[in-house]
Each structure stands twice: as structure tokens, then as C-alpha cells.
Amino acid sequence: MVGRMERQSASSSASCSPSSSAAGTSSSSSACGGKKRPDILNMIRSATCLNSSSTDTGKGRSKQSSNKVTHGFHLVEGKSGHDMEDYHVAEYKYDKSHELGLFAIFDGHLGDSVPSYLKANLFCNILKEPIFWTNPQEAIKNAYRSTNKYILENAKQLGPGGSTAVTAIVVDGKDMWVANVGDSRAVVCERGAANQLTVDHEPHTTNERQRIEKQGGFVTTFPGDVPRVNGQLAVARAFGDQSLKAHLSSEPDVRHVPINSSIEFVILASDGLWKVMKNQEAVDLVKSIKDPQAAAKRLTTEALARKSKDDISCIVIRFRC
């Protein structure tokens, strides 16, 4: 992620089905990069339900569920001089006779260990919550909190970095639960109009600034011109970031969206897209494209044309095509 975190010098057991990889079909996966991982990450990949995505530019063929929900994704590595730090989930699975569509974008900073861990564990943690089927909103909040607690407790293995998240769970093609921390965003097209489903957790907003300052932190535009928590991080909520744990929040905003005939499609994307494109622009660009993978590719291509230098990850979910 370009510009979110001020980079510093060197001195300073679930049983779920496998997810899609960044390159190829929704049923495949590939190992990330060529860097040696901490042992804890190797253990995660072999023991948990969701393998890591590729760091390469990639795409996924559109897939359709039994409830006529289709999805496709497209990922582009940025031009910031570091490895891809965006990860995604886009898959269907069955739980208690219900079909679940699981979709997420995890936009990392200061390395990709935290988003990789989230890809492997966050949905499993949500679905393992005992109250998931009776109170999905609280289950999602509980899982976000417990996942972040684990990440912070294992910062020595997972590293100093962090990640934003936007997640969507589609239940039987009828209900969708959207949650986020940070500035990765979900936007729905409803009768042709764009409606933002998530909240951009930026440090300069009144509520976030007050919370940060109450916890002993501060918000400043120095260095640079972007408001940052303690001069470091350009989002007020995120997973990880051990050095800022006292002043950051991992509490998600959660929203329930009943899927009715007015809901056409949803776009999930990292800020590499939203920095250069307004919500309605994104919806207008792809509302006539019925193939969700082609729509996701169109959005990332346009973001590149608008000189986005960040990693760009985009998932399009289309209903009842």
C-alpha cells in the first residue's frame, strides 16, 4: 500500500474449504512470493482453511453459486517498489445446509504477513463463533476482536505490519453481512445508484480523532500532507500494527443488507481503486458489464489509467444474473 504507512529503515485448527488464488480459477491456490516465511505462517497454511493468494497480477474466472450469485476478481500489483500486500478471498462453501459466499479484501502495510494471516483465519474465526447463526453482527465483531488479539500477541512471528479489511458474507443469496476496518470499501449498486456500505476509518474524522486522542495518541499531517495516527498510519482502524496498538481500533463497522430485486451488484476494493475513483463512477463504469470478472478487470484497468500507483484488488459480486 502506497503512502498509508510511513516506512522506516531497518534500524528502527479449522476445517474449511480452500479459497481461490489470485491467479486462476476460484478453486485453485498458489504460494506467495519467494520470501522465507516465519514458521507460524507455514503452520497457518497447512492447518487452516484458506491458503494465501499469489502476489502476482491475477484474475479469477467468474463463478456462479446455486443461488445465482456470480463473482469475479482482478488484482494488480502496484508500482511502489515493494511486493504485493493485498490479499483476497472469493469462494462459496456450505455450512449447516446454508450456502455461504465469502468475499474479502485485505490491504496490508509494512509487509504481507498480517493480510496473509487474515486470509487464512478471519472467516474461519467468524464461522466458529457460537452465535453466528443467531447474531451474525456480534459474531463478526467478536471474531474481528479475537483475531486482532492473536495477531498482536504474535507480533514477533507476524512482524510489525498490519492490514485493513473489508469482508462480505452472502447467505443463501438472500442476506449479506458487510464489515470493515480501515479504508478498503464496499459499494452496492441499487437501481443504478451507488451506495457505500462501509465506513472509511480515517484519522482526521471527528469521532476517530477524539478516540485516538482519548487513548493518548495524536493525529498529524507531519511528515507529508496526509493525516496519520502518531505521524505513522493513515487509517484509524486496522489489524495488527503492534507499535500503535494502544491508539488503533480493530472494531469493525457491520451492516446487514437484505438482497432484494433492487440490488444489482457489489464492488469490494482496496483503496488503490477508491483513491482515484468515486463510488458512482465505479458503478457507472461497470453496470452494463454482466460478467463480474470482466467488470473487476475494467475497474482495475481504469484505476491504472488514472495513475493509481498502489496495489489494486477488486471483487465484483452480481446477484441473480
From Swiss-Prot:
PPM-type phosphatase domain boundaries: 70-319
Annotated region described as Disordered, given as residue ranges: 1-36, 51-70
Comment on bound cofactor: Binds 2 magnesium or manganese ions per subunit.
Entry binding sites for Mn(2+) 1: D107, G108
Gene Ontology MF term list: metal ion binding; protein serine/threonine phosphatase activity
Signal peptide extent: none
EC number assigned by the record: 3.1.3.16
PROSITE patterns per record: PPM_2 (PS51746)
Reaction catalyzed: O-phospho-L-seryl-[protein] + H2O = L-seryl-[protein] + phosphate; O-phospho-L-threonyl-[protein] + H2O = L-threonyl-[protein] + phosphate
Short name of one Pfam family: PP2C
Family: Belongs to the PP2C family.
Name of the protein in question: Probable protein phosphatase 2C 44
Gene source species: Oryza sativa subsp. japonica
